[in-house]
Amino acid sequence: MSEQMGEQVPLRPLMRAKQNEEGKKRSIQHLSLETIAERLSGQLRGAQEDLCRPIVQQITRGKPVTPAALRSSLKASRPELEHRLARLPSDVEFDRAGNIVGLGVTLVPTSHRVQVGGKQFYTWCAFDIVLLPPQLDVEAQVQSTCPVTGQPITFVATPESTVLDLHPAGSVMSLIVPAERGDCTRATFCQQSLFFQSEQAAAAFLAEHPDALLLSVEEAAHLGRLVAESCSKDAT
């Protein structure tokens, strides 16, 4: 479990695996969670937080976001809202009626299932799961799937970045820190952030992604809180 806010958390070294020219040896680069959080928050920070936040909040209630509800929330005209929606990332999900059903969190099933307040939804990636509780001040029940073994990974994530009832206990999360803001898309960032049931299960992923980091779920939850706090400060 993580320590209280403001205190340093003793963490095992974060790993960055990189093969040499012969492909036989690996070098390990040590990065602090604070350094990773600073880089992540700078790249993940959106330019339309006042638009994205109500979308995320509504989806976590298990409901699509209608244009009418957004216009009311933002006090925006139809043309203004259409203009702003057009500026959202191209991977935002819409249903056939034109309602938003996915933006980081989604009503479209993925391998990352979340339950908050009795409402079920999904996320695009593992990092979205650990970012959500501190971002929205909620407790989340999580069930993900290891892409290698197909086995479930379950835990409870709290707003304070505490991880409860983790099973399997040695589960880890992969992460690739984007080099540029444009790299923070579902295809490039989200698809590389996964839960594995063990470091051994993640070995092949690390071999294929030499710039990937591997974190314990507790470390990942603490990182999620650091990023959420950073983005919140910048938004005020």
Language-model segments: residues:
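Short alpha-helical segments that sit at the start of domains
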Residues: 23-52
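A short, conserved structural fragment
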Residues: 89-98
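Short acidic, hydrophobic short linear motifs in intrinsically disordered regions
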Residues: 59-74
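Long, low-complexity, charge-rich intrinsically disordered regions
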Residues: 2-19, 121, 141, 151-236
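Short amphipathic alpha-helical interaction segments
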Residues: 73-89
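Aromatic- and glycine-enriched beta-alpha-beta binding-site module
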Residues: 102-152
